Amino acid sequence: MSESNVSWEVVIGLETHVQLGTKSKIFTSASTTFGDDPNTHIDPVVCGLPGTLPVLNKKVLEYAVKAAMALNLNIASHSKFDRKQYFYPDLPKNYQISQFDEPIAEDGWIEVEVAEKGKETYVKKIGIERLHMEEDAGKLVHAGSDQLSGSTHSLVDYNRAGVALAEIVSKPDLRTGREAAEYAAEVRRIMRYLGVSDGNMQEGSLRCDVNISVRPTINDPFGTKVEIKNMNSFSAIQKACEYEIKRQIKAYESGEEVKQETRLWDEGKQLTKSMRSKEGSSDYRYFPDPDLGPIEVSNELKEKWRSELPELPAAKRNRYSTELGLSIYDARVLTDESSMATYFEKVVNEGGAAKSSANWITGDLAAYINSNRLTFDQLHFQPSELAEMLKMIDTGEISGKIAKEILPELLSKGGSPKQLVQERGLGMIGDPKVIEEIIDQLILKHPNEVESFRSGKKKLLGFFVGQLMKETKGKADPKLANQILNKKLQG
């Protein structure tokens, strides 16, 4: 039956798989290095050979707990590992070690700033159901196709198998594709600030599965849930959600059934397509892993790890806005990467004004960083040197134009802006007598313009300012030059 007059509510939840940045895997000492030759980081435990026993990597537990704390989750004093049974070539044991009914952390939340196109930015609190630890699976490469269907054969690389994951499951609190993308971006931001993951989506360090349904707003029950996979950017998450919302609403309004299934996002075609029917938890036949003991986290350990947490992005954004007077936009851009925020704070601590520091860092410096594929940690131009340049602008030693002229060399080599200005003879002319002499010459050279100015064409002041800057190669102190010009031209 058509429901074209019905108002639809969208319900979205995200499962975010974060690869924890430990040097070795979750239950073995095998390396986690990315990009090496296939099947070079495997051992008997990874391969599930008989007689091998897993041992939990303590650093994995630390990273998982710190991640949970940053997401305001309650840390369980007691949790356990379970075996999740499924038969697929990327799991050599034919089961995955995960956590089912007793995860390491539950019931948290984060606040997300959402900038919807054409709408005012708003803050939304998103609940987080749980965080649990598990091992990653291997990677299948399908020859002749990007998926199993259509391929001639498949190859499996177990280098990724056994890499530690923290799976973060949100509550179904998201209502738009934009909210889903912003939530995923904030989770990644937090993980990177903590240093527990690099969050590289292209390398699979952070992967998101979207669970999405629609329902008439007059009804309470959720609609049929569809899972979407294969999104490797925040833009893809948003677009996949938006496509799937339209697809499901169209199906319901046409009287069609929406199946509970897993679908893949096709970036090329910009649509989702059916992959397989979705299993329920009972299909995985979970049971406690007999080879791994219970996980216990003492209060002392919790307090120690909590004391090591850095200031997180949301707290920084708030501080930059309330204490430093920055706009919400500037605070958001500066805190997107921890290295940029650290650089900014060092500049301010060295005496750079917050607003001008933000403008230069998010503008010229960020453009240089992006075009050269660097991070602020790798920049030759030190925070103290940028602060020195900003103070020179503020005191009138150089103009903004001269600062931009010397910036390319400072960015590529670093060094003292003051010394560079002296070497190039670019310092501002601040001596009134020198400026007066130049202005007197200009007045003699342009008598007609002087007469027109005195007759009321005050816009000609800009002409004389331009001529003065041309004569001084932009080095005349603008404020002083305007004062003297006004006085001289008035006669």
From Swiss-Prot:
Q: How does it assemble?
A: Heterotrimer of A, B and C subunits.
* Any single biological process term in GO: translation
Q: Name one Pfam family in it.
A: GatB_Yqey
Q: What does this protein do?
A: Allows the formation of correctly charged Asn-tRNA(Asn) or Gln-tRNA(Gln) through the transamidation of misacylated Asp-tRNA(Asn) or Glu-tRNA(Gln) in organisms which lack either or both of asparaginyl-tRNA or glutaminyl-tRNA synthetases. The reaction takes place in the presence of glutamine and ATP through an activated phospho-Asp-tRNA(Asn) or phospho-Glu-tRNA(Gln).
Report whether Glycosyltransferase shows up as a keyword of the record.
Answer: no
Similarity comment? Belongs to the GatB/GatE family. GatB subfamily.
- Annotated organism of origin: Prochlorococcus marinus (strain NATL1A)
EC number(s): the record gives: 6.3.5.-
Please identify the protein, giving its name as recorded: Aspartyl/glutamyl-tRNA(Asn/Gln) amidotransferase subunit B
Class in the EC hierarchy, top level: ligase
UniProt-listed PANTHER family = GLUTAMYL-TRNA GLN AMIDOTRANSFERASE SUBUNIT B MITOCHONDRIAL AND PROKARYOTIC PET112-RELATED, GLUTAMYL-TRNA(GLN) AMIDOTRANSFERASE SUBUNIT B, MITOCHONDRIAL
